C-alpha cells in the first residue's frame, strides 16, 4: 500500500462587487452584483517537502481570469489524498469546487480535508483559532502582514493589476502555507485518532 499524499493549500479570492445604498445591514440582491468573485492566487506545498517545492500561482496580467489557476487546483485535488487548509472545510475547498463547477471541470478524485482551525478548536481552548494567532505561538514562521497595502487595499490593487500588489500577495500567501504546516505538525499529536 502506498503512502498517502498530503499537501497544504491556501487560496486568496477576489470580492464580489455590488451596488448598495448604505454601509450597514445591507441585503444585496442578485441584480445588484456586477462582478462575480474569482480565485486570485494560491499557494501549495507537499507536507514535509522542502520549501523549494512550494508552488505559488496568481492571475497577474488578467486578474479576473482564474481558469488556469482553477485547472491547477483541480490537478492538485485530483492527485492528493489529503489537503490541509486553515478554515479549509468552510472556505477553501468549497470556493475551489464552486469555481471548478463554473469552469465545467469534472469532479476530481475524492480528497479529505484536514482543517487546522477545526483541529485547534478540537484539542484546546486557544485565545483564537485564527492562523495569525496560532502561527504566532505554534510556528517559527508567522502569518505575514501586508503593510504596504493594508487591509482591503491589497485585494483592490491586485484587481487593478498593480505589480507591487501582486508581489505583496505572493509574500502574504506563501507564509500562510509555511506557518500552517508548522501549526499542523504541532497540533497533530494532540488529535485523537489522527495518524502521526
Predicted regions and their residues:
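Conserved RNase H-like, two-metal-ion catalytic cores of nucleic-acid enzymes
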Residues: 1-78
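Conserved DEDDh/DEDDy metal-dependent 3′-5′ exonuclease domain
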Residues: 50-138
